[in-house]
Amino acid sequence: MRRLLRVVLILLLFPPLLAGVAGWFAAPAFLHPIRRALTPDLVREADAAFVHVGGRREDFTVRASDGALLRGWKVRASNPNRAWVLAFHGVGDNRIGVVSHSEILLRAGYDVILMDSRRHGASEGEMATYGWLERSDARAIVDALVASEHPAHIFALGESMGAGIALQGAAADPRIEAVVAEAPFASLREASYDYAGLRWSPLLGKTLFAPFTWMLVSRGESLAGFSASGISPEKAVAERPFPVLLICDANDVALPCRHAQRIYAAALGPKSLWVVPGAFHTKALGFQPDEFRRRVLQFFANPAARQ
């Protein structure tokens, strides 16, 4: 009986212990995601896409508040409407990840800013902080844009991590008038439950593998000097009322629809939630291109009307 009890205890305690160790070692990688290089081939492909819709690209460099150099592009529409859209890519990606979205906007007369997020692509920055520093980066980008272009309107569009940054950036800077956010995370801690649950069930991340989440977040806070509770698009949309179009990919296992639903419930401003049947993580444009185009352009044309 004692032997059986020891076996049972080992079976019960080993997975949480292993999860805690894994979380401890995963934290540095979480803050230092693999960079997707901005290769000459990718730049040529992007340029071809811009030329196809009449866009004109130029380099755009911004100095962040902590001194990091953020690199990206301004892309001007052939028939500009004096509104600019900041396009934010996802984790482990770079500005190329939102080129297809930019094509839609450029055709409609929107000028677009595509920046590599800190610690991504060609931008500097010691760590990715998922909105803690990036919201200030967004403000620096807007400062530089306003100084050079005097835009009539500024909007934002983001994918995954970029969606979270766009929402947090808009909450902190009222010059960003409205946000389209596809596959956003509700909070850093809530996203860690999905990560710890192996993209199978967040319940695993909250129970059996909870030590992974605890150690990942705790060590991340220690290494980066941020408070995880302060990295929350869900809280951000409750701080300032601004229009949001939330896009949820129905088959998303990385950041399931509950994240967008929580943000929708918390949002104080005009809001709309579009659930895209069959779409995987950040693939709404690929699954329903015409509807994506219609909804995004309609939203930016009259953000406050989106209820």
PLM feature spans:
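Alpha/beta-hydrolase active-site loop
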Residues: 97, 128-149
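The serine-hydrolase catalytic nucleophile loop
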Residues: 91-104, 117
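Short beta-strand/loop motif that positions the catalytic acidic residue
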Residues: 239-241, 246-248, 252
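Conserved alpha/beta-hydrolase "acid-adjacent" motif
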Residues: 253-259
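An N-terminal hydrophobic leader/cap segment in hydrolases
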Residues: 4-8, 13-63
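Conserved alpha/beta-hydrolase
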Residues: 104-124
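Catalytic active-site module of serine/aspartate enzymes centered on a nucleophile-bearing elbow/loop
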Residues: 287-307
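Hydrolase active-site cap/lid region
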Residues: 169-226, 235-236
